[in-house]
């Protein structure tokens, strides 16, 4: 990430919301004591495959996967994306090359809009409905000044962990709200770091609390 990230320039993958000291691991904003955060980066990847032949990023050979990752820049609603291409003659074989995806214009695509992309999320494809399901944390006040946050909120304003929600999409880009999974009674009652699996017509969800 540091090879691609330059805090002094507004570049394609975004810019950290607060000023940071690259030598200080946990201090994005020295003016807000107690409101610290891990350093910026892309992490906690989801491995997905695009199976719709009409999609711009569809690979008819079946050898392309996409990594959709938490975009930790202290903002909310975005995720990072990378493309992984298998070099073998058949899917599942050969060396795997990681690169950036591209827009139809030819420009590199490094970030996409994704509800809850600022925290760990889980994407699951359902072949029956042909939909991607997204389990993620809902942020409600990421633009509140850090010094004005309630005492029971940890770290930065976008780091809200007690509202777990569900979305669905047919293309990984356009997400529709499906419903609320769980809400903790207070900001300290976390409902996040969740995962899910399909059981016939049901979604089984496991969540940190």
Model-derived features: where do they sit?
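Beta-rich carbohydrate-recognition and catalytic domains
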Residues: 1-44, 48-115, 126-131, 137-187, ...
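Conserved beta-strand position repeated once per blade in WD40 beta-propeller domains
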Residues: 44-46, 120-122, 193-195
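Internal helix-turn-beta structural module
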Residues: 192-204
């Amino acid at each position: 990430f540091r090879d691609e990230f330059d805090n002094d320039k507004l570049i394609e993958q975004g810019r950290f919301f607060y000023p940071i000291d690259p030598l200080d691991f946990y201090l994005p904003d020295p003016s807000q004591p107690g409101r610290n955060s891990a350093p910026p980066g892309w992490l906690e990847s989801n491995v997905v495959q695009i199976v719709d032949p009409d999609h711009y990023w569809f690979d008819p050979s079946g050898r392309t996967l996409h990594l959709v990752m938490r975009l930790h820049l202290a903002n909310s609603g975005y995720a990072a994306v990378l493309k992984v291409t298998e070099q073998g003659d058949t899917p599942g074989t050969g060396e795997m090359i990681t690169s950036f995806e591209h827009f139809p214009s030819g420009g590199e695509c490094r970030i996409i809009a994704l509800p809850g992309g600022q925290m760990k999320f889980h994407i699951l494809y359902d072949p029956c409905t042909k939909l991607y399901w997204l389990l993620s944390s809902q942020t409600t006040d990421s633009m509140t000044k850090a010094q004005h946050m309630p005492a029971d909120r940890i770290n930065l304003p976008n780091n809200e962990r007690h509202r777990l929600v569900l979305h669905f999409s047919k293309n990984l880009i356009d997400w529709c709200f499906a419903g609320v999974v769980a809400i903790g009674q207070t900001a300290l009652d976390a409902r996040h770091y969740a995962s899910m699996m399909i059981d016939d017509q049901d979604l089984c969800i496991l969540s940190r609390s």
